[in-house]
Amino acid sequence: STEEVYELVKGYGEAARRSMEAVVDAVEIHMAHGYLVSTFMSPRTNKRVDEFGGCFENRMRFSRLIIEEIKKQTEGKIAVLARINSDDEVPGGLDVHDSAAIAAYLESCGLDAIHVSRAVHIKDEYMWAPTVIHGGFSAELVEEIKRAVNIPVITVGRYTEPQFAELMVKEGRCDLVAFGRQSLADPHMPKKAKEERLEDMIPCIACLQGCVANMYAGKPLCCLTNPFLGHDAEPLKQAETPKKIMVIGGGVAGLCAAFVAKERGHEVTLYEAGEKLGGNMRLAAYPPGKGDITNMIRSYIHRCQKD
């Protein structure tokens, strides 16, 4: 009902106030991916006949009231961001021209920065971006939204190469780049990039197996390329008595066992019967769109060879 919408607006403000009391610097309102606020914005899903439906301003009223309520309850002491779609990717949904207008409107409502994602759940290949979708796949759409506003624009969408992310900012196509799954694979990636240690970076191969699949299953996140995910703050226990260790088999499991033992202080020799390392994962990289798997193999080999 209309009354319930106003109750929801109040709830957003109260949540932001609690966040401020917990000493956060900013809050982000989720207005993307077909979630609640997003459904008000789109004429495809908003069929209301009250003041929250119909024309553009009515469909944006919920968003505007949320921003105003958050600003009121936090007294403007924290930044307010919003995440929107660049394109819903469904017939009758919002396209990039709609989203540019939405971004400009949100700026006029007092928004401090805008975070641009893409697609709704029924077109979720553009939400999760598996390996068949190239990195930075929404760059052109983000650029169009950037031209419509003066506030900082954040882009997201399978950015795995820091060189490309840096280029996006340098060329003025966005102001910041968000790293999601790549931060799970390697939370130290920005530091390594700054120090020009690109070979040391652990790649995200967009397999979705340990992150998105586990999220939907209600399980703890894990990562195929980063076996230490969730234990990053725990130092690798050094061996009290270093040993000479022989690892037989140069597939990814053998490579991982070898570099972990090496990093614990053991002297490790890796044996592989074939001519090349990587095992069956090399075959897995051959189907179309699966080439990024070789980045994982290359990373593991580098960790074994590194002094």
Predicted regions mapped to residue ranges:
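Flavin-dependent oxidoreductase catalytic cores
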Residues: S1-I248, V252-V268, K276, N280
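N-terminal glycine-rich dinucleotide-binding loop that anchors FAD/FMN and/or NAD(P) in oxidoreductases
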Residues: M201, A284-D307
